[in-house]
């Protein structure tokens, strides 16, 4: 059944491919709305623009260290859908209206200041690393091979350069960004606009929503957060830095 909140109405997505709805976009791509995520007050994430959605499983080594991502289940493409933010939906990852029953408090507490104004900088020989700790989603790609904060200081070595770029680029939250010291340019992975549902194999918990490719995230009050290549949104409902993940799901 559909539910209505704050002027929005959402319907639980069908369990099969909906060719007619998909065709709205494929017939005339020029009319396709730009991807966007609107936060509904004390409710879900309203996703528009036909953003692809799939599971992203963290792959670990024998020691449990995070190494790569493995793509899991892909969901049918839809023009608009609502993703659970309270963490208690019976139809995860989609919203089923449970937030109203449990009186979910989705108050946003995250700063709207630009990332670079909140991050600290660690200097290395050929690279820089910026770090905004409050964004940590506890994916732990920064830990292998001596930890990224130490590795960046060794970037006179090609292997250390490779590891820093890899580990920073795999940080789903964008807490960590590697920079070329000479050019001053960020060393960012290339993402198409899409959403990933992180699944943490080592911790056996579901992680945040991984927003990729510069998708705007707009507060319930209409104010947009800084558009970034990668951020993670809380989907357990318990983050103290809403709407962003703070790693509480793995605590």
Language-model-derived ranges and their functions:
Residues 18-25:
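Intrinsic-disorder-associated, low-complexity terminal segments enriched in Asp/Asn/His/Tyr and depleted
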Residues 26-51, 55-57, 188-205, 212-214:
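Short helix-coil boundary/hinge micro-motifs
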Residues 45-47, 81-84, 93-95, 143, ...:
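Short, structured motif recognition centered on aromatic/hydrophobic residues
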Residues 92-103, 137-156, 166-183, 242-251:
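Iron-sulfur cluster-binding cysteine motifs and their immediate structural context
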Residues 70-85, 117-138, 148-169, 184-187, ...:
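Ferredoxin-like iron-sulfur electron-transfer modules
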């Amino acid at each position: 059944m559909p539910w209505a909140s704050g002027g929005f109405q959402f319907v639980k997505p069908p369990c099969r491919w909906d060719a007619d709805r998909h065709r709205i976009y494929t017939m005339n791509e020029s009319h396709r709305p730009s991807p966007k995520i609107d936060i509904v007050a004390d409710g879900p994430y309203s996703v528009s623009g036909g953003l692809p959605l799939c599971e992203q499983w963290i792959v670990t080594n024998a020691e449990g260290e995070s190494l790569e991502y493995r793509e899991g289940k892909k969901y049918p493409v839809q023009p608009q859908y609502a993703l659970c933010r309270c963490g208690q939906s019976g139809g995860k990852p989609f919203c089923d209206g449970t937030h109203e029953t449990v009186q979910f408090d989705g108050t946003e507490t995250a700063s709207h200041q630009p990332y670079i104004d909140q991050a600290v900088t660690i200097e290395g020989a050929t690279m820089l690393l910026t770090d905004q700790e409050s964004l940590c989603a506890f994916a732990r790609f920064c830990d292998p091979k001596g930890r990224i904060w130490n590795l960046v200081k060794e970037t006179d070595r090609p292997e250390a350069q490779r590891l820093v770029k890899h580990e920073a680029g795999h940080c789903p939250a964008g807490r960590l960004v590697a920079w070329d010291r000479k050019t001053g340019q960020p060393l960012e992975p290339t993402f198409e606009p899409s959403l990933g549902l992180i699944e943490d194999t080592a911790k056996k918990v579901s992680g945040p929503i991984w927003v990729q490719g510069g998708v705007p995230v707009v507060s319930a009050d209409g104010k947009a957060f800084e558009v970034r290549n990668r951020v993670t949104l809380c989907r357990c409902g318990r983050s103290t830095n809403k709407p962003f993940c703070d790693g509480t799901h793995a605590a």
